[in-house]
């Protein structure tokens, strides 16, 4: 990505890190007007530090088998030292506890994903 500008920072974008195509398609269809979603299974596909900061928040699928969600959180928090909101979807209590210790922000059931997306899009609408 080119050097971030004020215009690119004001774009309303969210990243969904999940291998679940149905979840990604559902979230994409539920996006409010003016928002865009980037769906990936590898955090590196979002780019570097400055690229990831262009997203308002991230939705992370804790039920993923294609990647380790804890590695994603570790990369964002420890390696990149980013303080972007990480909203976790799914996962059992042990997965959620591990993600909480890794410094993920919020946790929701899979069936609440659309409502969570719309709620946070409203909060990050600036």
Model-derived features: positions:
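Short, structured coil segments at secondary-structure junctions
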Residues: 31-34, 82, 101-104
């Amino acid at each position: 990505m080119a050097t971030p500008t004020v215009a690119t920072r004001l774009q309303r974008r969210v990243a969904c890190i999940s291998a679940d195509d149905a979840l990604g398609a559902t979230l994409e269809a539920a996006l409010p007007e003016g928002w865009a979603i980037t769906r990936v299974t590898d955090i590196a596909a979002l780019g570097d530090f400055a690229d990831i900061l262009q997203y308002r928040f991230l939705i992370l699928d804790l039920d993923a088998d294609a990647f380790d969600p804890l590695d994603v959180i570790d990369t964002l928090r420890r390696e990149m030292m980013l303080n972007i909101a990480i909203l976790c979807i799914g996962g059992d209590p042990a997965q959620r506890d591990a993600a909480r210790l890794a410094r993920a922000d919020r946790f929701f059931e899979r069936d609440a994903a659309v409502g969570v997306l719309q709620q946070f899009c409203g909060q990050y609408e600036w």
